[in-house]
Amino acid sequence: MKQIDFNRRLFLQGLAATAGGVAAAGITPALAAGPTIRLWSAPIMRPFPTWEPFEEQAGITIAWSPKSASADEALSKMMVGDGKKLYDAFTDNGGGMEDAMAENGVIAELDTSRMKNWNLLRDEVRDPNGEAAHSIRYNDKIFAVPYIANADSLAYNKTVLGQDYDSWAPLFDPEFKGKVAMQNDFGPTMTVTAIYLHESGQMNIKDRSNMAKDEIQGVAEYLIEKKKGGQFRTFWNGFQQGVDLLASGEVVMMSCWEPIQRVAAGKASQDIVYGTMKEGHQVWNNIVMLTKDAAKRGVDDAFYKLADTCLSPWYTTRQLSRFGFASLTTGMVDYLEAHPADFNVADLKATLKRKEQRYAVKGNAWQNVYPKELRAYQEWWSRVQAA
């Protein structure tokens, strides 16, 4: 498996299919009105069976093409292929893509005054000096709008284990040998391992999101040692395998995406918990970008309507309800309380509270699928896989 292929996107396609079907590329709903925007996005951007509710809310027509899991494909298509002609807007494949696209002149700088919901963004994103400011900026200029975010953590089966956990340590503890799993992707797995090793004092790692070569080697060798000792039941690939591992009881704890935990808990009818790890988590957001060519074609008005809708509590609460993802925006609790007939308000407020607890952990590290030493990450991850 190519390491740059970010596995979350495999889940995005699979989850959308189970939640109502993935539309064929380039669909334009007949009943939609307003300006048309050609959108190339991950299916997770649509928390509805069709785009029609979003189109009605935004006042636009969406001609949608589902986006694949490959970051390599996205870079190739938008930088040297026909992507700029085919699409007006597109989503990313993980942290750092906005830098590559802006640097190569693919995407347009954004005018935030054209989005009335821009001020709903949390300070850590909106403030140029905020912790997450980099995730939507290039050279201090804004090029992207976030639509979902999370802090990935550890899921554990409290029904089986009989207690709560607030540390990554049990994932590497021989007590649970053969009953734990991690993701088959160097990004999240090496990042959370680096967070644990650094915060527990076992290694000194300056930047857990962008490690130096010797740090990459140290983290990989730790994983190799654990793997050779039989610590891991497996390294999971894709949403369905993750759900099956947890729901079946084949593993009792696993690093994973929050929707995997939510679906597995329901499938197993057990108390499978998504914890808050005291060492930290991999934090991320996904973004939508406007191509420069689309701005020249006059599609920018439709883009700002799309982006503004993504920032609205109407959209973010529906993302939370359907997929368990939140947003780096405010106003969700007020919206939930104002629309109790549309949501399980108590459950979603509890989910948001747990997210806030994870966001607040000092040791968190931001997702980065384009680290400076990418080749070293790839080479050492290959050794982990082969061990």
In which residue ranges do the predicted regions lie?
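Short helices/loops that flank or line small-molecule/ion binding pockets
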Residues: A74-L86, A100-N104, P170, Q240-E250, ...
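Early extracytoplasmic/lumenal segment of secretory-pathway proteins
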Residues: A33-A100
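N-terminal secretory signal peptides and thylakoid transit peptides that target proteins
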Residues: M1-A19
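C-terminal capping/gating helix-and-loop segments adjacent to ligand/active sites or protein-protein/ligand interfaces
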Residues: T317-A387
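Periplasmic-binding protein-like
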Residues: P49-T50, G178-T189, T309-D334
